[in-house]
């Protein structure tokens, strides 16, 4: 059985003091969660948040990383740095990174391989735009992004990868793919992983849905056969809302 994973991506919100307050509120509300709980604060919050979540069931994620261990890469953060401050998961290839910062499939792949080689679990984001969806290209786009991201990932490592299907048109818009639609895409993703790594490995890979996930729609999403959790945006900035999602 795949253990569900619910992760809150705070994006560019929360100063360190606000971050501490948020996790302190969250801890008692999610202590009995059956799902794996991950918070993904901005880089400057990670150390403070890590101190507060020690000894709890909350795990730490980062929003991005560079693929080199060190060097003259001004403004970048390396996997070694993240590892040392207690990070377990790293979001890679979020549509906002692709859209605003020119992140390509090739860059995403380099980051995925680097994360895995340093013992970090990548949460690899894939998803189609509204125009791609309207042109009937959802499956083509999403499956291709996935194949590109996983190039060179070993059979042993694939089980440490989490995939997040985030249709771009649903992020922050209030629009959500129907649970059935999301499940169809996620099923196709799992079949693609099976074609690359075999059915047994594919059955162990967790695939989340992301895109306007909120307390009102989480149980419907989680009732589907292949949806293994959620990558939550705005709703993860309010402890009580995120807790309701985690405790679906």
From Swiss-Prot:
The lineage of its organism: Bacteria, Bacillati, Bacillota, Clostridia, Thermoanaerobacterales. The keyword Secreted does not apply. Pathway: Carbohydrate biosynthesis; gluconeogenesis; Carbohydrate degradation; glycolysis; D-glyceraldehyde 3-phosphate from glycerone phosphate: step 1/1. It comes from Thermoanaerobacter pseudethanolicus (strain ATCC 33223 / 39E) (Clostridium thermohydrosulfuricum). NCBIfam families: tim. Signal peptide: none annotated. The keyword Isomerase applies. Keywords: Cytoplasm, Gluconeogenesis, Glycolysis, Isomerase. The active site is at 94 (electrophile), 166 (proton acceptor). Pfam families: TIM. It is found in: Cytoplasm. GO terms for cellular component: cytosol. This is Triosephosphate isomerase. Substrate binds at residues 9-11, 172, 212, 233-234. It catalyses: D-glyceraldehyde 3-phosphate = dihydroxyacetone phosphate. One of its GO terms (biological process) is gluconeogenesis. Its main location: cytoplasm. Involved in the gluconeogenesis. Catalyzes stereospecifically the conversion of dihydroxyacetone phosphate (DHAP) to D-glyceraldehyde-3-phosphate (G3P). Homodimer. Belongs to the triosephosphate isomerase family.
